[in-house]
C-alpha cells in the first residue's frame, strides 16, 4: 500500500541530500573569542555525523557531545561505527565533552509507570539495564577520550518528592560505580525527569556529595518547569556543575504556552547566566542543544540561528 508523503517530509528528504558543506560555505560572521569550551550536540544539526562535525568546524568550535549518530543511539552504536566516528573526530581534532547517555531516562520501578511516548533518542532501556549501561558508557567515554557521562533521574512522576529517596539512592550507587571507574557522571536537570529544576538538582548533588557526580545545568529545562533559571536556578547549582546545555524558551502571550526558541530569542537571561559562569571561574564544558525548529523544520539552519544568537551574546559579554 502506498503512503502519502507530507510536504514537510518531502522538504526534509530534499535537505538531507544537500551536502552540509554547501551550507557551511556561506560566509561566517566573526564573533571573537569564546570564553568557554563550547560545542554542539551533533544530532541537533543532522544525523549525518560527518556533516555535523563539518558544521561545527565551520564555526571554529572544537567540542561536541555524542548522543545519536547515524540514526543510532550512542549506546547501540556498533564497533565499526564507533571507530568511524572516532576517525572523523580525530580528523577534525575535536574533543568529546561527554557521552550523552540515556541512563535513568526510563520509569522508576517503585513509582507508577508513565506510558506516554517520550523522546529517548532511539533508546529503549529499563532499570534492569542500568548497571550494564553504566559499564558500557564508561567504555565509550574512554574510547572517545572523555571523562564524563551524562545521566538522568527517571521519568518525572506527579509528585517527584515521593520518588526522591529512590532517585537519590540510585544516583548515589551510580556515583560509587563511577568512582571505581574514574568517571564523572553529570546529572542533567531534565524537565521530563524527577530532577528538573536547579533547586532539585542542587539538592540531590549536595545530599549525595560525591566527587564523581556533578550537574549538567540546563537552564532551558528549568524554565520549562517555571523556575527562573538565572539567577534563581543557577544559585542552587553554582559550584556543583561540570557541563551545561544552552537553549532558550519563549512564552506565547495569548496562551501562556512555553516552547523552544533560538538562543537570544526567548526570555532566559543568557547574558547574565554566561557572565556569572565566567565570573565564577566555570571551567567545564558547554553544549548548544538547539531543540528549537524553524517553521520549515530545517535542523541545521535552526541550529545556525541559535548558535549565532549565542555567539552574539558572547561578543557582548
Placement of each model-derived feature along the sequence:
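Active-site acidic/histidine proton-transfer and metal-coordination neighborhood
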Residues: 14-15, 20-25, 107-215
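Aromatic/hydrophobic pocket-lining residues that form π-stacking "cages" and hydrophobic walls in ligand
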Residues: 52, 85, 137, 174, ...
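Glycine-rich, proline-tolerant flexible connector loops at the mouths of alpha/beta enzymes
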Residues: 67-85, 157-158
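Aromatic-lined substrate-binding rim segments of carbohydrate-active enzymes
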Residues: 78-93, 98
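A structural motif corresponding to the C-terminal end of an alpha-helix
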Residues: 91-94, 140-145, 174-185, 273-282, ...
